[in-house]
Amino acid sequence: MNFRVVGLAIALAVGLVSWVLTCAAWRFDHVTSGFLPLAPRAFERFTLVALGTAAAGEDQNRRGSAVAAGVGSDIALVDAGRDVAEALRAAKIPPSQPGAVLFTSLLPENTVGLDDLLAAAWLAGRRAPIRVIGPPGTAELARHVVAEITAGVVARARALGDDPAPPALDALEVGDGAREALGGLALRAAALGDGPLPALAWRIEAKGRSAVVGGTGWDGAALEQLARGADLLFHDANHVPSPEEAAAMSLDVDPERLRREAAFYTDFDEVGEIAQRAGVRTLVLYKMRQPAVLDLQVTSRVDDVYDGHIAVAHDGDEFTP
């Protein structure tokens, strides 16, 4: 008997079994992570999580706009776009954990996940109202969301023998300079004018670090003022072709529509200039209508005018200012 061959066969068999068991364990963890209860997540350092990075249009590769800011067990969301509950689970944050939602504006891409968040939080056992802070119109939005889901949420709770307390949002409408706090997070709003509806940018500070989430493409001067000296700036970045560029590319687009869209978004050069003048250490770009195939396609344009670190956010990315 060739013992060397037998030994090799045994080693291969053991390796194969180990590989199969490892794959099975990974598959089990992957499946169960989608429904098992999550323990509250604690952030040792002040951290921002890009839960969703899509712009207004549908994007099968990106969830709707939402950024989580956390320190310790205190978590605030900036905007609540589509699939926000799933995005929280992917980040290992229970949907019942965020204590507040800060809206940058009431554009639908920022708000359509609020009912999803509230329903998921109540299903997970939360019974304390979630704070919702935003521009004028936030209170009415909150009332509609609660009215939309209350009957179903309460009916299910009663059927399961759970606490049938109805879901609740504690809405607050704020303007320029408003200051709020959520545990270890200090929150400050700046109004962004010149847009089609009221909008805010948010500065969030914790443990001596600071981050600003802009989210809308107008009033760069106000955003620059709020972001002055910040460690990190989250903001949209989009290039809309000029009528001349569109003509050169043989695009059949109404020139007036292009001008209007350009006023709605922040161009690559502009966002870099805002960050440079404000002295921001790191610039994170999200909400791109047409995400680049390679991040370098974007960062190479912005770094012509900005000297700091540049990142293109993808769903699930985490940043520590």
Whereabouts are the PLM-identified features?
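Short, surface-exposed acidic/glycine-rich loop or hinge patches that mediate macromolecular interfaces
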Residues: P108, G137, G217, M288-R289
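Binuclear metal-dependent hydrolase catalytic cores
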Residues: N2-V212, L223, Q297-T320
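Cap/insert and terminal regions of metallo-dependent hydrolase folds
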Residues: F3-G7, A11, G15, S210, ...
